């Protein structure tokens, strides 16, 4: 049984199929009705940019599983062609620079093929372009407008880590191609971790307590009165037989993948799209239970701690790592959502393909204090507990202290009460 990456399924306590069904789908467009101010250049004379960290979701992909009992879309190999403009010289390694670890998640996708001949969960040509375009957006800001990064890839400036899944690795590659326009002084290393130790998504295989706590909440999520009623209705509308497993996350995964790639969708879904989006998010909200501090700690505590540690290293400036200017993390929707919940800015919308959370660390030119600015899909966010969009680092650290967790504490917590029976 493996860690979940994306759309969590009822097989939360299952086996390799559990991996394959895990990842959730993606809204076609960001469509954020935010009240936050758009991300603009720093009140530039006052703040000097010191560090950028970007958590980004992979691009558009094939679905993880098709809705049962409905006409399947044909996911043909032509949809996965690699554009020349995304090609770079890169290598995938473990965190120490050794061989890439095995990927049980990817292996689970390749035990079956979708109609049309491709595997589930594969980055498509459209997804590659989406990440290339995100790289272009970062290039405009950090190379052209702010002259913060070198115009070519430099391993001393840029650190790249991805979950050990082909679509996230390829997404990282495409972003780097857009960011540096295929100009590189070094081979681009993309670092990965073995599945059991992965912290870049809620790891239900590596953290027994998380699996225990989430298992019952996953089962509950489809039985909540409003969700259960709507699920019964849509199952009837689609003509899905009662014995087939179906939930709104699975429906959304297939629906949005088809919609994004302009492939035929069951006509019966047309009037249900908004409801499917809403109920899928309702399920995730229930499963992650953001009001439960411990649950978010187990989901993304080590990720948040890593982001804070990178900032502290930059502030201290006394190690070779302090030369880094950009950290890139290629992750999943199920990484971004609990991070947004912990930050207090989740807008109850599913993160679209190529969505990003960007953390910028600044130093004020006059008082020499450090500040953090967060944006989500290019929109500045005022974090609860912060006095301004430019949040004093001490305030930001305090705001995340409830959820950030060093890996040692994380492992201790994961192994605590792991033998408590589910309820």
Question: Where do the language-model regions lie?
Answer:
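Signature for phosphate-centric chemistry
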Residues: 2-423
């Amino acid at each position: 049984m493996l860690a979940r990456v994306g759309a969590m399924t009822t097989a939360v306590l299952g086996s390799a199929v559990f991996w394959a069904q895990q990842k959730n789908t993606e809204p076609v467009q960001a469509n954020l009705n935010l009240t936050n101010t758009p991300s603009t250049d720093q009140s530039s004379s006052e703040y000097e940019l010191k560090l950028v960290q970007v958590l980004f979701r992979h691009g558009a992909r094939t679905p993880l599983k098709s809705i049962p009992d409905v006409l399947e879309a044909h996911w043909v190999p032509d949809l996965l062609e690699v554009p020349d403009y995304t090609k770079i010289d890169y290598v995938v390694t473990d965190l120490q620079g050794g061989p890439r670890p095995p990927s049980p998640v990817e292996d689970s996708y390749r035990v079956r093929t979708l109609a049309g001949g491709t595997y589930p969960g594969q980055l498509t040509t459209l997804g590659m372009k989406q990440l290339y375009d995100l790289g272009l957006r970062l290039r405009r800001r950090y190379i052209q407008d702010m002259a913060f990064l070198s115009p070519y890839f430099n391993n001393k400036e840029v650190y790249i880590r991805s979950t050990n899944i082909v679509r996230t690795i390829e997404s990282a590659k495409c972003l780097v191609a857009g960011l540096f326009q295929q100009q590189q002084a070094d081979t681009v290393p993309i670092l990965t971790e073995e599945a059991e130790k992965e912290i870049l998504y809620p790891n239900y295989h590596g953290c027994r307590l998380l699996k225990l706590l989430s298992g019952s909440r996953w089962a509950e999520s489809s039985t909540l009165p409003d969700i259960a009623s709507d699920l019964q209705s849509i199952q009837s509308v689609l003509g899905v037989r009662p014995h087939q497993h179906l939930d709104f996350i699975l429906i959304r995964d297939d629906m949005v993948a088809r919609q994004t790639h302009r492939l035929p969708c069951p006509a019966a879904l047309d009037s249900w799209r908004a409801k499917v989006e809403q109920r899928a998010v309702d399920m995730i909200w229930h499963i992650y239970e953001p009001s439960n501090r411990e649950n978010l700690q187990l989901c993304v505590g080590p990720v948040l701690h890593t982001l804070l540690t990178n900032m502290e290293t930059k502030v201290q400036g006394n190690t070779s790592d302090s030369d880094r200017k950009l950290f890139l993390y290629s992750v999943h929707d199920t990484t971004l959502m609990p991070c947004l919940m912990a930050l207090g800015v989740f807008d109850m919308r599913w993160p679209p393909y190529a969505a990003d959370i960007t953390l910028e660390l600044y130093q004020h030119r006059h008082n020499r204090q450090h500040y953090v600015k967060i944006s989500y899909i290019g929109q500045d966010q005022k974090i609860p507990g912060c006095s301004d969009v430019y949040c004093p680092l001490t305030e930001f650290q305090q705001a995340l202290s409830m959820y950030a967790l060093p890996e040692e504490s994380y492992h201790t917590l994961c192994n605590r009460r792991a033998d408590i029976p589910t309820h």
